Curated annotation (Swiss-Prot):
Biological processes per GO annotation: mitochondrial electron transport, ubiquinol to cytochrome c
Species per Swiss-Prot/TrEMBL record: Pseudochirops cupreus (Coppery ringtail)
Presence of the UniProt keyword Methyltransferase in the record: no
Additional record remark: Heme 1 (or BL or b562) is low-potential and absorbs at about 562 nm, and heme 2 (or BH or b566) is high-potential and absorbs at about 566 nm.
Cofactor(s) for this UniProt protein: heme b
One of the record's GO cellular component terms: respiratory chain complex III
Protein name: Cytochrome b
Similarity section: Belongs to the cytochrome b family.
Amino acid sequence: MINLRKTHPLMKIINHSFIDLPTPSNISAWWNFGSLLGFSLMIQILTGLFLAMHYIPDTTVAFSSVAHICRDVNYGWLIRNLHANGASMFFACLFLHIGRGIYYGSYLYKETWNIGVILLLTVMATASMGYVLPWGQMSFWGATVITNLLSAIPYIGTTLVEWIWGGFSVDKATLTRFFALHFILPFMIAALTIVHLLFLHETGSNNPLGINPNSDKIPFHPYYTTKDALGLMFLLTILLLLSLLSPDTLSDPDNFSQANPLKHSPHIKPEWYFLFAYAILRSIPNKLGGVLALLASILILLIMPLLHTSKQRSLMFRPISQTLFWLLVTNLLVLTWIGAQPVEQPYIMIGQVMSITYFLLIIVFMPLANSFENHMLKP
């Protein structure tokens, strides 16, 4: 009997990607986050689609339309909470996924890694625009401050900002275009994810040992489909607990007031997942310098394959590099805390020290540790 999943043109693609895919037998739970990101994206697209059916992208009624969704639409409050907290879960999985890639040397699959960085930037752009849509106080001032950063670009800055705004300030035109872009970008993310997987399946998955796993591979199904299903249950449990019991924990209280261009928010800060980058931006007194540091903090991921000089791929057997990796994680957590604090001493100084340390760890200390560990391997 002909096995349809191995012969049908469409099912054959799915079979080679998710069923008969040869997978290293020793990949740990850290490899679960790729599938969790896929599920998170599906949750975001579905909840976002239902929200878009009731949301009105107009400055006069946007805030009221969100209130209407929560009060009058059947389970609208749940859809809205799942969408808002789903974004937090998405970014949590994203950061853990990138961290896993750095720890186990997955960045040496250059095409997969570079597409991943492009995906990160696209997801960040989507989330930034989504934050503007409820048209609360923090939405408005966040949009004003972040878009205004582009005015730091020499010669064309001011023109570029006004072009993005569609006027001389953040207004109706800005909200409408942000809604349109926020709606279309997740589908671009889905397309990029397919390209990401395409490149990954060209090489096969990395593994914790960082060695060639071709001698010991098992089919993806049923082993890793079961493992991913367990991860998904954990993700959904946390998301539902957050959305049902404490939906506003990660929100800013300022965003419960309607946007008022005449009243300035005392402390402008983005959602928690952007705080580390915001802290780096604020730590430099110069506007253009801050924007460049902000960009560099993300784009530095692109040069990671070039900075890898170790004879070993993974950090599993490299204690010095492991220590530096965990210092980098701690550094990012401190930057996240600093980003939420007001601009005053001692936070300014801590932010500046941590920003410098962040770049030094990646560009100087990690490559030095690589060389030192190579030297230690010599008999």
